[in-house]
Amino acid sequence: GLLGFVGSLLGGLGI
């Protein structure tokens, strides 16, 4: 999500 790590799973905004 955010930068392509855990954020991707929660946010889904990035890689």
From Swiss-Prot:
Q: Sorted alphabetically, which keywords does the UniProt record give?
A: Amidation, Amphibian defense peptide, Secreted
Would the keyword Secreted be found if you checked this record's keyword annotation? yes
Instruction: Name positions with the PTM Isoleucine amide.
Output: I15
GO cellular component terms attached to this protein's record: extracellular region
For biological process, the GO terms are: defense response
Q: Does the keyword Secreted apply?
A: yes
Report the domain of life of the source organism.
Eukaryota
Give expression by tissue.
Expressed by the skin parotoid and/or rostral glands.
**Role description:** Caeridins show neither neuropeptide activity nor antibiotic activity.
Q: What is this protein called?
A: Caeridin-6
Q: Which organism is it from?
A: Ranoidea caerulea (Green tree frog)
